[in-house]
Design a protein with these regions (language model features):
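Well-ordered alpha/beta subsegment
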Residues: 100-138
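Residue-level recognition of beta-strand microenvironments
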Residues: 62-64, 68, 124
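Residues immediately within or flanking Cys/His clusters that coordinate Zn2+
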Residues: 26-29, 43
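Flexible extramembrane loops and terminal tails that flank transmembrane helices
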Residues: 1-27
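Glycine-rich active-site loops that engage anionic ligands at enzyme catalytic sites
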Residues: 66-106
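Short, cysteine/histidine-rich loop/knuckle motifs that typically chelate Zn2+
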Residues: 31-34, 45-51
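Short functional micro-motifs and their immediate structural scaffolds
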Residues: 40, 54-55
Length: 138
């Protein structure tokens, strides 16, 4: 694996289990143990009912592009070889529209990305410790 020079996520006590599961190529989120709604991003208590109870739940590997931008300007030198690239809000299937993740749409020309486009999860192992969830067209 080549040296990865881009910024990496900095997990905290709430998000570390999410990143651990990504490393195992599993996308998951907290689901409230009282009201049953998803918590996204991971956090200590439910934003809906304020319960501290939760369980980690495996999520769908498919979703839909809700919104996106195409980055053309290099603000961080490590991304110079990537422009233009797509940063998208992906609404995950089977979450009752409760989870919209920010990620990249890859493996397609940026000109082909559209709102409403169905996408599938792919994992990118960027270091021996960090795996990033990204999406590609279905």
């Amino acid at each position: 694996m080549a040296d990865y020079t881009k910024p990496l996520p900095i997990p905290d006590i709430d998000s570390q289990p999410f990143w651990d599961r990504c490393k195992a190529h599993e996308l998951s989120a907290q689901r409230c143990g009282d009201c049953g709604k998803f918590r996204w991003p991971p956090q200590a208590f439910c934003p809906h009912c304020y319960s501290w109870k939760f369980e980690w739940t495996k999520l769908s590997e498919t979703g839909t592009v809700y919104s996106f931008v195409v980055v053309h300007y290099v603000s961080i030198p490590a991304f110079e070889g990537d422009v233009p690239y797509v940063v998208a809000h992906i609404t995950l299937d089977n979450t009752d529209d409760q989870i919209t993740m920010i990620s990249n749409v890859i493996q397609c020309p940026w000109q082909e990305v559209r709102i409403g486009m169905p996408v599938r999860l792919v994992f990118e192992d960027v270091t021996s410790e960090v795996t990033l969830p990204k999406f590609r067209p279905m």
